[in-house]
Structures are given as C-alpha cells and as structure tokens.
C-alpha cells in the first residue's frame, strides 16, 4: 500500500541545511494501522507530509496506493490526494459551518450532487457517533466531538489511506481512548490503512499493528508492536516503552524500595501472551522457601496479545533466590535483577 525507498528531505535556508528525513525505507501493508513515534524534531511530521505530496522528497521515492507521489504533479497529484486523507491535532474545522456542512465540504469540492452529499454525510455522522449534532457548530462541540467531525470529513471521499498527525495530542486521556477506539473500529470495518504519528507510546500500544521509531530524521527501529515492547533494541525505543511499562510512579517506588532494602533481590518479570495470565507468584511461594513481596505490576493489551511487567522482591537464602530466578525463566518469563533505577 505504501512504499518509501531511501527517502530524504532536506530543508535549505540561509542559516544552513536541515536534514528532516534521512534515508528512510518503509513498507506499510494494506489495511494495517502503522505508528510512527518520535520526540519533537524527529522528522515525523515531515515524513507524513511526504506521503500526501505536501512536501516533495529531496531524494528517494514515495509510492502510495500504486501511485508514485514523489513523481506526479498538478491534476494527477490532486487526484491521488483524494485517496489520502488526513486528520490533525487542532481539528482544522470551518467554524462558520455546521457539523453537517463541515463533513460535506470535501464532497462539494469533488462535485458530488447535493442528494448524494446528504446521504454520504448521514452515513458518516452515524459511523463516528455524532447523531443529534448535525446542526451544531464547532464552538458548541467538545474536543473529542471536533475530532470526530475531522475523521468523518477525512472519510468523505472514501480514501484508501488515513494519515493522523498527532490526532489525540490535544485531548484528555479518556477522550484519547475513545478516538483511538473509533479509529480501530474504522480500520476493521472499512479495511482502511492508517498511518499514525505520535509521541505517546500509549497510543501505539493501544491500536497499532506495527511501529517505526524515529530519531534525528532516521528510522532507528521498526517492527510488530508486541515484539518492540518485549525486546526494544535502541535506547530511544526503550525510553518510549518505559512510558507504558515503567511510568514515573513505578520508578519512584523502586528507587525508594532499593534504598531501604539491604537483603534479597528485586526482580522485574516480563510476561508475554498466555504467560501473563499464569499464577507464577503462587507457584513460587508454594515451591520455594522464600518471601515474595509484590511491588508493582501492570498488564497491557496490544493488537497482537497481552504484555505485562511485574516487579517483585524475593528474600531468602541466596541459593533459594537463585533457584527462583531460574524457575521464572523456565516458565518463558523474562527475569531481570534490578540493582538501581
């Protein structure tokens, strides 16, 4: 569906060149939700603008839905963009138009008849859950409702690809989850390919099938979301994964505990799939002469299965504690002894 081959984008100015995107090669499959994550300045937004031709690459090729976006211009590019829609962080609605008229706007531009516009708008309003808000203006809507209008408008011309540029960054956590749920539902119902730009690993974990991590214009890591969570390779990726698995509260708890404890071992357990649901701690207590203290834990769902982490403290004779670590590993659970945070 989307292929990028050795794509680079350099912005030139009198103050010097900025290498926004550097030699990126990516393949995004039809019907998947693909996440691109990175901090500010990583090159995410520049990359997404290359996908719909808002920017042209300095080198390399960009192909979307069978068209080489990097090589077409004018009427052909405008036609290609009808198959590549986009939603934004700040909604970009027309404030003088109602919900109905905002959604109808791209259909008007495309020359669709009024009767067909009204029919399509009614379908989209139902799809995004805005029944009863047809005649409301953007100023009368919540942030989540505004983004739903943006999504409906983006879907008006039946695109093959939906680009989401920090689409949930301006929303509160509960509203973020509702919008992510809507995008996931649309992906399943319509088979729509979604490319999602974010700086929040929670967003990636929640709905993406695969993810690419960007730093300084480069893709430093790429893979299935569950695999990236289990075994992140790059330091940048590890920091993002820790947003979900080791939030600030967890680090504070561990730091305090390690400072106060002089015996035993503090162990981080990492569970994947069915192992996340096994009664491992009960088995340890029954099998070994040790004391087990559960410090903190969390199980999260990804599109490919469950992933969990649990921090425990095991105290007892050294040989018994060592046997516990070996036992944990024999149950297809990773065990890492924590000495500092």
UniProtKB/Swiss-Prot annotation:
It holds the Pfam family ABC_tran. It catalyses: L-methionine(out) + ATP + H2O = L-methionine(in) + ADP + phosphate + H(+); D-methionine(out) + ATP + H2O = D-methionine(in) + ADP + phosphate + H(+). Gene3D superfamilies: 3.30.70.260, P-loop containing nucleotide triphosphate hydrolases. SUPFAM superfamilies: ACT-like (SSF55021), P-loop containing nucleoside triphosphate hydrolases (SSF52540). Belongs to the ABC transporter superfamily. Methionine importer (TC 3.A.1.24) family. The complex is composed of two ATP-binding proteins (MetN), two transmembrane proteins (MetI) and a solute-binding protein (MetQ). This is Methionine import ATP-binding protein MetN 2. It comes from Bacillus licheniformis (strain ATCC 14580 / DSM 13 / JCM 2505 / CCUG 7422 / NBRC 12200 / NCIMB 9375 / NCTC 10341 / NRRL NRS-1264 / Gibson 46). The lineage of its organism: Bacteria, Bacillati, Bacillota, Bacilli, Bacillales.
